[in-house]
A protein has these predicted regions:
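A conserved mid-protein helix/loop that constitutes part of the nucleotide-sugar donor-binding site
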Residues: 17-22, 222-245, 251, 262-268
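Carbohydrate-associated surface elements
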Residues: 177, 199
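Nucleotide-activated donor-binding/catalytic signature segment of Leloir-type glycosyltransferases, i.e.
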Residues: 268-284
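Aromatic "clamp/platform" in nucleotide-sugar-dependent glycosyltransferases that forms part
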Residues: 285, 304
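Short acidic/histidine- and often glycine-rich active-site loop of Leloir-type glycosyltransferases
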Residues: 314, 327-337, 341-342
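Short hydrophobic beta-strand element within catalytic cores of glycosyltransferases
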Residues: 321-324
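Conserved acidic donor-binding segment of nucleotide-sugar-dependent glycosyltransferases
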Residues: 336-337, 341-348, 356-361
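A short, well-ordered alpha-helix in the C-terminal region of glycosyltransferases
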Residues: 349, 356, 363-377
Length: 383
């Protein structure tokens, strides 16, 4: 039995967090002694964490700059001190440091958080994404081996943690396109870098898809669905424009999008500006998207960037006809015209592809047959 510390930000609904919950379950099944340490202990996915896992929150033992404290008010709870530390980080980043010295910013924030004093066999910074967890894992934990995860091929955030990544023994990338990008940035760390697909419990996805679905908003004879955070890389602004084009062509449909995110209100406003707020509906967060996926007619994913999109795996496991943007990470799962469809991320071409697929019943049946036959196996890397 190994003692393993897994680091995360929260357990809010998101692909990374879903994959982390599945990984925790896998580690428990292997009889490992697992602790999950979060920046903030919150989120709807906390209920998916096995009871055998000890779940804790980072302890912040210093308060932020007095000027910032006067702005946001005085608070004493651990979660609020965590908020303070992040607020101090943003303040220092913009005023004192800047992009080129982000590592120094994290070093300052590390002074405000208590170290993890236990000795572990393994530390996994599962969240990655240039988050504070990478700095914490590198400098505030003790373990024989440490690993960090890279979940996306767009590494714009790398400046935040590049000073800390060399302190990890393994760099796990969730797809080959991600691995290539990491090696391009860190050629000296190529021997530590390998692909390890996010583990997804397919049987659990299928079980959860059988749960009753009662949502008065989720109606219509022709339903499209997308699941994911409302952020720039997901391409939802393009989705609004595709919706407007399909409406102009006379197609009667509804496109539902499940997920919270920083761009949600902006996207709802954009839908109104394009006069498609009745056709593209941003549902916000749903704790269990699987029944929605099961009952949709097409699963659409117009992403600009991805790592190894878990939502595509889940849609495949439910034998849904998928149309996704033609980017490297999608090509790892989708073979155009065989087990799904790929399309350039262009409004007119995506609209054309949707109409073409809808008109081809025989092609859709062939795709579903292929999806029923092909295995989805993630066990090799977790043996």
């Amino acid at each position: 039995m190994s003692k393993i510390l897994v680091l995360g930000r929260t357990m809010d609904m998101g692909g990374t967090e879903v994959a982390m919950a599945a990984l925790l379950q896998k580690l428990v099944e292997k009889k490992e002694d697992v602790t999950l340490l979060l920046v903030e202990k919150r989120g709807v996915l906390l209920e998916r964490i096995p009871k055998e896992v000890e779940v804790r929150q980072m302890i912040w033992d210093k308060k932020p700059h007095p000027a910032l404290e006067r702005i946001v008010g005085k608070r004493e709870t651990p979660a609020e001190r965590s908020f303070y530390a992040r607020g101090m980080g943003v303040f220092l980043m913009r005023v004192v440091y800047g992009k080129k010295r982000y590592g120094k910013l994290y070093e300052r924030i590390l002074e405000c958080v208590e170290p993890e004093t236990k000795q572990y066999d393994l530390v996994f910074d599962f969240f990655g994404f240039g988050a504070f967890t990478t700095a914490f894992g590198a400098r505030k934990t003790n373990a024989r081996k440490k690993a960090v995860w890279f979940h996306g091929e767009n590494l714009w955030w790398l400046f935040r943690t590049r000073d800390f990544i060399p302190e990890y023994d393994k760099i796990y990338c969730v797809s080959e396109p991600v691995r290539k990008q990491v090696i391009a940035r860190f050629p000296e760390l190529a021997d530590r870098t390998e692909v390890l697909l996010n583990f997804i419990d397919i049987k659990q996805v299928q079980r959860r898809s059988e749960e009753p679905l009662s949502d008065p908003q989720y109606t219509g004879e022709l339903k499209f669905l997308t699941v994911g955070r409302a952020s720039e890389e997901k391409g939802y602004d393009i989705a609004v424009q595709i919706t407007a084009e399909l409406k102009k062509r006379g197609l009667c449909f509804k496109w539902f999008i499940i997920g919270d995110g920083r761009d949600l209100n902006k996207l709802r406003t954009m839908a109104k500006e394009y006069q498609v707020e009745q056709e593209i509906i941003f549902l916000g967060m749903r704790e269990n998207p699987a029944p929605y996926v099961k009952s949709c007619d097409l699963y659409l994913q117009p992403s600009r960037h991805e790592g190894y999109p878990i939502t595509i795996v889940e849609a495949r496991s439910l034998q849904k006809v998928i149309i996704a943007s033609d980017i490297p990470s999608m090509r790892e799962q989708i073979r155009d015209g065989e087990n799904g469809y790929l399309c350039p991320l262009d409004v007119m071409q995506f609209a054309d592809k949707i109409q073409k697929v809808l008109a081809d019943q025989e092609g859709r049946d062939a795709v579903r047959k292929k999806l029923r036959e092909e295995p989805i196996d993630f066990s090799a890397g977790y043996a």
